[in-house]
């Protein structure tokens, strides 16, 4: 079986001498290679600015040194840059916050249609390049590619298509007509697929309710399923981690860890404020406590995201100044895409803070639960998708404000040793039972079923 996979980006970077390398990326992109355990994969993605001028095709095994049971080839596609930039702006500033129940800007109708056309154009170009007569079906990932299934259906009417929504679907639908038009636009494209997969049951329900209440959208002939992404437990546990960094914390020192992209939904500023509120009550006789922030700069081409990075840096400085009486620097900011260093921190944390305003899943939570060696506690929020599976074994903040997070941290600190051990055990058991292999197998199974129909 051969499946054509289409995504916004591929995990490909390059060295200073332009040699292709495997680049650690967030979200669903980094787990897509798992599909190659069950089928041959031709993966088509858009060329990012940093990859312009580089080769257009790669063998994944050659650049990653990862071996899968089936072939995995990556193809990069260049599309019209002006349309891509316009679509990216709209996805970043309007669709992304809309899907995460955040405020959205006002738009005029003409502008809205221009953005829709830009997204349609990019989706059509990508889909046309991803078509191959030898493919048995197509798997599309990313809300930015919501219109790809429509083009695939036109060009390959008899091939099965699965669309995976890795973000949430909004839980409260805004009343303004622009927001409704955008959600109808997304849903119309997604409904061209045979199967639509979601991270949580709540997201599936909200999407289903939206379609039912907004004709002429209809679900006839479309299967909706929950298939949450997970982690490759064996690979995670077997990966070599750097020795440096393990000595930065003494055995009795307390580690608070927050790993995220620099994105408003990740609630990093509230996390810093919550720790600061807690640390104001630390005394010199207590073991030292550190909040290590591992931030991957995100969407830095946009002024708002540049501003957020500046705000975070400034907030760290101010908080450390407030806590200067402790005699050490309790908040440490690590900026960059250093997966190995972040993974090493996950083995050592006492408290992993993932209190996003909203999150499709948050794979860091699952990675942390598997890698941690100290019965560390995960402090999260109900709006993090992974909590649908793991919430019973985490501390959930009642509110996603700094005060709410600080209260949850206090609750976590007051847990008994036995409670921590049981929570850690149950987290590992749950993730091991429903690991990445099960997710990938479920994706491929749909194509095998539909192929027979």
What role is predicted for each listed range?
Residues 1-453:
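Catalytic cores of carbohydrate-active enzymes across secretory and cytosolic contexts
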């Amino acid at each position: 079986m051969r499946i054509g996979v289409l995504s916004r980006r591929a995990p490909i970077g390059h060295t200073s001498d332009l040699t292709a390398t495997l680049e650690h990326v967030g979200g669903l992109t980094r787990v897509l290679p798992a599909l190659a355990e069950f089928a041959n994969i031709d993966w088509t993605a858009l060329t990012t600015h940093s990859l312009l001028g580089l080769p257009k095709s790669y063998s994944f095994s050659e650049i990653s040194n990862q071996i899968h049971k089936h072939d995995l080839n990556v193809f990069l596609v260049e599309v019209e840059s002006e349309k891509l930039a316009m679509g990216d702006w709209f996805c970043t500033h309007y669709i992304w916050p809309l899907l995460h129940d955040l405020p959205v800007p006002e738009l005029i109708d003409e502008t809205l249609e221009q953005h829709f056309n830009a997204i349609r154009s990019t989706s059509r170009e990508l889909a046309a390049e991803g078509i191959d007569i030898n493919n048995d079906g197509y798997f599309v990932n990313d809300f930015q590619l919501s219109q790809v299934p429509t083009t695939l259906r036109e060009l390959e009417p008899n091939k099965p298509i699965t669309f995976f929504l890795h973000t949430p679907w909004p839980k409260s639908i805004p009343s303004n007509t622009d927001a409704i038009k955008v959600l109808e636009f997304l849903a119309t494209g997604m409904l061209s697929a045979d199967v639509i997969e979601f991270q949580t049951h709540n997201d599936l329900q909200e999407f289903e309710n939206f379609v039912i209440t907004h004709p002429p959208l209809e679900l006839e002939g479309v299967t909706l399923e929950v298939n949450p992404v997970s982690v490759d437990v064996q690979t995670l546990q077997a990966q070599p981690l750097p020795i440096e960094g393990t000595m930065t914390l003494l055995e009795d020192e307390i580690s608070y860890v927050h790993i995220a992209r620099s994105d408003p939904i990740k609630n990093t500023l509230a996390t810093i404020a919550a720790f600061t509120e807690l640390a104001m009550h630390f005394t010199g006789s207590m073991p030292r406590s550190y909040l290590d922030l591992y931030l991957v700069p995100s969407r830095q081409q946009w002024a708002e995201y540049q501003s957020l990075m500046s705000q975070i840096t400034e907030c760290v400085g101010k908080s450390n100044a407030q806590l200067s009486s402790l005699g050490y620097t309790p908040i440490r900011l690590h900026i960059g895409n250093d997966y190995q260093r972040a993974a090493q921190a996950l083995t050592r944390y006492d408290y992993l803070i993932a209190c996003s305003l909203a999150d499709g899943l948050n794979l860091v939570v699952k990675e942390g639960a598997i890698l941690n060696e100290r019965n560390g506690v995960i402090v999260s929020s109900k709006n993090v998708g992974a909590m649908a599976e793991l919430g019973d074994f985490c501390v959930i903040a009642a509110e996603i404000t700094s005060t709410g997070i600080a209260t949850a941290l206090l609750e976590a600190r007051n847990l008994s040793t036995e409670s921590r051990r049981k929570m850690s055990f149950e987290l590992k058991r749950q993730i091991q039972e429903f690991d990445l292999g099960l997710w990938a197998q479920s994706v491929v199974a749909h194509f095998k079923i539909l192929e027979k129909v």
